[in-house]
């Protein structure tokens, strides 16, 4: 969405100029053009710094039935049957800085602050009298800090290709560092994934007046690590395990439309495949391959030559995807 906002003014300007100027013959792009750092591009211009403040609201809900105990016979259940309805809300406040080293090379750093709250409504259906309970779990802290490099491969001939490399740290609270109760439920919610990751990506941008077509392909490689898992709830014994969190393959595509030099909007589809995780080199029997699909819509308005307001909404299309996400971004160019 940030690239579409950056291109919207350029696309609108090209549309106006095309009505007044005669088409010029195209010149073949050379290797010198590909390596020239002073040509204008679609990333942050050389020497410019952009401060991007963002806020996102994510809502998700799920229903599940679990058995606390074990079965002796197929028709005989020993233990409790718990039916739960969980509403998850996540608020994220992010501060991102982008600096143009050259017109085609950009560096980025992002610091998020995460607040999470889960409302869990449970009913024990197999007890003598069904008991309804409502439990709320919260968690707030700094999230996983990220850093990224972006490089525009070609400058003159569309489509424009941009390569990226993103690094994610483990500054947020890990799921393996927060306390759990006797039923292995979180008593405090984590704010990070607990594992560092590296994400290479490739983005294509194709201006077609008055629209811009874009596509992105990326792969998130989660680096495996040794963690301590509480295997007994009574005497606090721990067991060290090597966990390899499932990697993620992401693909997204869409179109942006420039209404005028100040306003543009976009619509797109996103797909993520999260591979199965491994514990001590083997895949657990209950591990799942997750498919996340979502539909997004965004609007960009140029408040001033240095400030832009970006609003985006995303709706989940599959069971594993978040139900709804609303994001607001305000990039401000300092130089």
Where does each model-flagged region fall?
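Outer-membrane beta-barrel biogenesis signature
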Residues: 13-73, 77, 173-175, 335
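Extracellular loop and loop/strand-boundary signature of outer-membrane beta-barrel proteins
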Residues: 37-38, 79-83, 130-137, 185-190, ...
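Residues on the lipid-exposed face of transmembrane beta-strands in outer-membrane beta-barrel proteins
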Residues: 39, 51, 55, 95-101, ...
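Transmembrane beta-strands of outer-membrane beta-barrel pores
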Residues: 55-61, 111-117, 153, 167-173, ...
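Outer membrane beta-barrel transmembrane domains
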Residues: 64, 70-74, 226-335
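Residues that define the transmembrane beta-barrel architecture of outer-membrane proteins
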Residues: 89-93, 131, 135-145, 159, ...
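Repeated loop/turn-to-beta-strand initiation elements of outer-membrane beta-barrel proteins
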Residues: 105-107, 157-161, 210-213, 262-265, ...
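Hydrophobic alpha-helical segments and helix pairs
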Residues: 140-196
């Amino acid at each position: 969405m940030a690239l579409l906002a950056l291109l919207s003014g350029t696309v609108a300007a090209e549309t106006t100029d095309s009505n007044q100027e005669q088409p010029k013959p195209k010149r073949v792009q050379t290797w010198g053009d590909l390596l020239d750092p002073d040509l204008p591009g679609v990333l942050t211009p050389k020497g410019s710094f952009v401060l991007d403040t963002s806020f996102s609201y994510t809502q998700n809900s799920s229903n599940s039935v679990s058995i606390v105990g074990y079965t002796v016979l197929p028709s005989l259940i020993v233990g409790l049957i718990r039916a739960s309805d969980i509403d998850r809300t996540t608020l994220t406040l992010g501060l991102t800085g982008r600096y143009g080293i050259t017109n085609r090379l950009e560096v980025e750093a992002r610091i998020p602050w995460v607040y999470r709250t889960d409302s869990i409504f449970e009913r024990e259906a197999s007890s003598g009298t069904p008991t309804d309970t409502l439990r709320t779990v919260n968690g707030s802290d700094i999230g996983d800090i990220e850093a990224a490099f972006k490089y525009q491969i070609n400058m003159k001939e569309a489509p424009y290709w941009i390569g990226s490399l993103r690094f994610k740290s483990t500054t947020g609270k890990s799921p393996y560092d927060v306390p759990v109760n006797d039923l292995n439920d979180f008593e405090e919610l984590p704010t990070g994934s607990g594992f560092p990751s590296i994400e290479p990506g490739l983005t294509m941008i194709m201006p077609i007046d008055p629209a811009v077509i874009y596509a992105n392909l990326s792969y998130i490689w989660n680096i495996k690590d040794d963690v301590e898992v509480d295997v007994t709830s009574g005497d606090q014994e721990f067991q060290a395990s090597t966990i390899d969190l499932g990697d993620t393959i992401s693909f997204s595509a869409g179109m942006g439309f420039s209404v005028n030099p100040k306003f543009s909007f976009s619509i797109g589809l996103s797909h993520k495949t999260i591979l199965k995780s491994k514990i001590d080199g083997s895949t657990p029997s209950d591990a799942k391959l997750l498919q996340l699909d979502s539909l997004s819509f965004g609007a960009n308005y140029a408040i001033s030559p240095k400030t832009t307001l970006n609003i985006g909404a995303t709706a989940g299309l599959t069971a594993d995807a978040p139900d709804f996400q609303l994001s607001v971004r305000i990039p401000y160019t300092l130089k």
